[in-house]
């Protein structure tokens, strides 16, 4: 019984060390994700993130639950600590599992329905939380659906409050929002709601530490963006002016222009709805006019999300990206739903028509009208893949020219356009001023992280100021001012080398880091440049993370070993206590007891002491686990067996005069003559 109890303590201790973030009393233990198809066979131990997922209850009265999936790197680099990034996909009504499993999350899904590692996962730069919202999207559910952006804001702020109740250790983290497409409406509205909440806190509430917004190919200003379909299509070579449908497309474009001119009031009070069917028709006509009916069925239409690709008509990109064919069955597996701790095993769909049909965005002002007030407090980054039609970069540039923020309209005319260099290659170009940064990403689609995982992750470095600004040689052998970002950990190692080289007369000038998050009004172009470019060095930070992980494992092993030794020691003491024989000698007249030991036991104790001293602790532990008799060994007797001397049971007579001796050492006799030992022979 005692052994079982001690083993139970050992197992519980091991679990406590193996899962330090959870316990029976910790509510987030219910959301811990420990298994997924392929997690242990395809993902290395050091690449497996700490994961939590589930449907978090917001309102019990109407069964509103938001599904989230959180990823945390177990070997965080210093720059990534205390940072939480909430990712939202668009739609409206499209699941953020697109972002988790096809873009910025640590996993992609292969044809076998198993997770494989994404080398460009954003969770290496901060904790990633992918949320299905509004209710009804993906794995989220409710009896009621939201109808406008104000409702969505209220519910997401409620989700954040519940989320940080579940993860109080993250409540003070720097918070960033990232997403794409219709998240260009969601994210500014939610950010505005958070900033207003922070100014009107109730008793006991704490502010959310909102630091910045990152919107990729966002649907932000419907007026200007709808007017960009035709100019972009012509510039990209998608359609030519000699197309037979050109005149009808031009007329539709003019109708869209008339709507925009009529409703785009300067004060934002009389604005067009977020989605205009008249303007949407322009894009539909372009896709119809460029259809190639002689091509294979799956290549007849231009992909509206990446014009370099083709798709079937009238899908025109709805079947893209190809990973969707793997993600959908994966998320519909009952075992996966169990792994993700789902309460309601609803059938997952990428986009919910029910949510989209319930949503009436015409009751909400387009998010662009919230930009001026948001930019007064936090930075916004707009990044665009240059191959996207539906939310193209020309539309983004168009509404920025008309936007007034922080005392000025549009970017300054003399503002430099800087190259963005990642890992010694030009990845795009950047403009930044007065808290607003625009990044055009080369060779990328509507879903930038899908096409450029590692490059897209470095966008986090830009918004957090983790970059260098310097002159770099371009293809024309001309030096051009550039923003330079690096693979994970490289910049820190580079800075360390430069710091050490400062003592040398030949050291180069260290670049000045510029942070776009500073509300100083200074652009990225005001930073000091380097005299020469440094090539990227191997990631010392990666080696540091590896060494730290090894150190953590050794520490954990030592802690576990200490527990084992302590339990073993307790067991030894307990066994010794239970095996100690009771005294069979009465006390003397003075009340002192006589110490009794078998004579041969004394000899054996001496031998055992010598033997045990020669053994190591591991050998003695193994001997103990083998179950040796802790009571000692008695010398054999001749004749009939004597059994229980203490209980006086089963004792039989001897026919042999040879008996075992035991020694009686009297405390009284020792007091009388401490130099003499009296020995006395006693018959059993």
From Swiss-Prot:
Residues 578-684 are cytoplasmic. Protease with a carboxypeptidase B-like function involved in the C-terminal processing of the lysine and arginine residues from protein precursors. Promotes cell fusion and is involved in the programmed cell death. It catalyses: Preferential release of a C-terminal arginine or lysine residue. It is a single-pass type I membrane protein. The lineage of its organism: Eukaryota, Fungi, Dikarya, Ascomycota, Saccharomycotina. Residues 510-538 have a biased composition (Polar residues). One of its GO terms (molecular function) is serine-type carboxypeptidase activity. Its main location: Golgi. One of its GO terms (cellular component) is trans-Golgi network. Glycans are attached at residues 62, 424, 435, 474. SUPFAM superfamilies: alpha/beta-Hydrolases. The gene is KEX1. This is Pheromone-processing carboxypeptidase KEX1. The keyword Kinase does not apply. It holds the Pfam family Peptidase_S10. It comes from the Eukaryota. The chain crosses the membrane at residues 557-577. It comes from Debaryomyces hansenii (strain ATCC 36239 / CBS 767 / BCRC 21394 / JCM 1990 / NBRC 0083 / IGC 2968) (Yeast).
């Amino acid at each position: 019984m005692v052994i079982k109890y001690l083993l139970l303590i050992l197992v519980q201790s091991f679990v406590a060390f193996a899962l330090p973030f959870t316990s029976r009393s910790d509510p987030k233990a219910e959301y811990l994700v420990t298994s997924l198809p392929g997690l242990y066979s395809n993902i290395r131990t050091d690449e497996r993130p700490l994961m939590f997922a589930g449907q978090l209850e917001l309102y019990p009265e109407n069964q509103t639950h938001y599904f989230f999936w959180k990823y945390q790197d177990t070997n965080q680099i210093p720059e990534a600590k205390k940072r939480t990034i909430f990712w939202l996909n668009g739609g409206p009504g499209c699941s953020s599992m697109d972002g988790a499993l096809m873009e910025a999350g640590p996993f992609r899904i292969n044809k076998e329905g198993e997770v494989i590692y994404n080398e460009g996962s954003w969770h290496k730069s901060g904790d990633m939380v992918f949320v299905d919202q509004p209710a009804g999207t993906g794995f989220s559910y409710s009896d009621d659906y939201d109808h406008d952006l104000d409702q969505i804001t209220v519910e997401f702020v409620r989700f954040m409050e519940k989320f940080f109740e579940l993860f109080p250790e993250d409540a003070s983290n720097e918070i960033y929002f990232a997403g794409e497409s219709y998240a260009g409406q969601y994210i500014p509205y939610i950010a505005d709601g958070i900033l207003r909440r922070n100014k009107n806190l109730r008793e006991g509430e704490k502010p959310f530490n909102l630091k910045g917004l990152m919107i990729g190919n966002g649907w932000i200003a419907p007026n200007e963006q709808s007017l960009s379909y035709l100019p972009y299509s012509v510039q990209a070579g998608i359609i030519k002016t000699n197309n037979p449908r050109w005149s009808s497309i031009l007329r539709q474009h003019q109708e869209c222009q008339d709507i925009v001119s009529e409703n785009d009031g300067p004060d934002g009070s009389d604005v067009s709805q977020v989605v205009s069917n008249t303007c949407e028709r322009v894009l539909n006509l372009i896709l119809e006019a460029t259809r190639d009916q002689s091509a294979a069925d799956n290549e007849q239409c231009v992909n509206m999300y990446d014009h370099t690709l083709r798709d079937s008509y009238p899908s025109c990109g709805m079947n893209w990206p190809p990973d969707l064919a793997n993600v959908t069955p994966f998320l519909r597996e009952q075992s996966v739903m169990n792994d993700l701790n789902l309460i309601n095993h609803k059938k997952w769909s990428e986009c919910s028509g029910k949510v989209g049909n319930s949503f009436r965005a015409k009751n909400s002002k387009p998010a662009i009208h919230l930009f001026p007030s948001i930019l007064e407090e936090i930075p916004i980054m707009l990044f665009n893949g240059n191959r996207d039609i539906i939310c193209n970069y020309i539309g983004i540039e168009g509404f920025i020219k008309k936007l007034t923020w922080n005392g000025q309209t549009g970017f300054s005319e003399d503002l430099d356009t800087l190259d963005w260099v990642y890992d010694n290659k030009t990845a795009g170009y950047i403009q930044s001023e007065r808290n607003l940064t625009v990044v055009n990403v080369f060779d990328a689609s509507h879903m930038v992280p899908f096409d450029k995982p590692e490059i897209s992750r470095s966008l986090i470095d830009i918004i957090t100021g983790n970059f260098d600004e310097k002159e770099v040689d371009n293809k024309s052998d001309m030096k051009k001012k550039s923003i330079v970002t690096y693979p994970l950990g490289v910049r820190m190692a580079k800075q360390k080398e430069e710091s050490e080289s400062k003592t040398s007369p030949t050291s180069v000038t260290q670049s000045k880091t510029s942070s776009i998050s500073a509300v100083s009004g200074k652009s990225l172009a005001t930073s000091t440049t380097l005299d020469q470019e440094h090539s990227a060095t191997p990631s010392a930070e990666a080696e540091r993370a590896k060494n730290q992980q090894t150190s953590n494992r050794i520490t954990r092993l030592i802690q576990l070993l200490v527990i084992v030794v302590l339990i073993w020691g307790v067991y030894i003491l307990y066994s010794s206590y239970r095996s100690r024989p009771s005294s069979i000698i009465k006390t003397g007249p003075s009340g002192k007891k006589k110490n009794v030991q078998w004579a041969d036991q004394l000899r054996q104790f001496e031998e055992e002491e010598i033997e045990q001293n020669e053994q190591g602790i591991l050998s003695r532990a193994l001997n103990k686990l083998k179950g040796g008799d802790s009571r000692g060994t008695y010398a054999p007797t001749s004749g009939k067996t004597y059994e229980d001397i203490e209980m006086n049971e089963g004792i039989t007579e001897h026919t042999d005069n040879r008996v075992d001796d035991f020694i009686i050492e009297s405390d009284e006799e020792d007091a009388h003559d401490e130099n003499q030992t009296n020995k006395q022979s006693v018959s059993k």
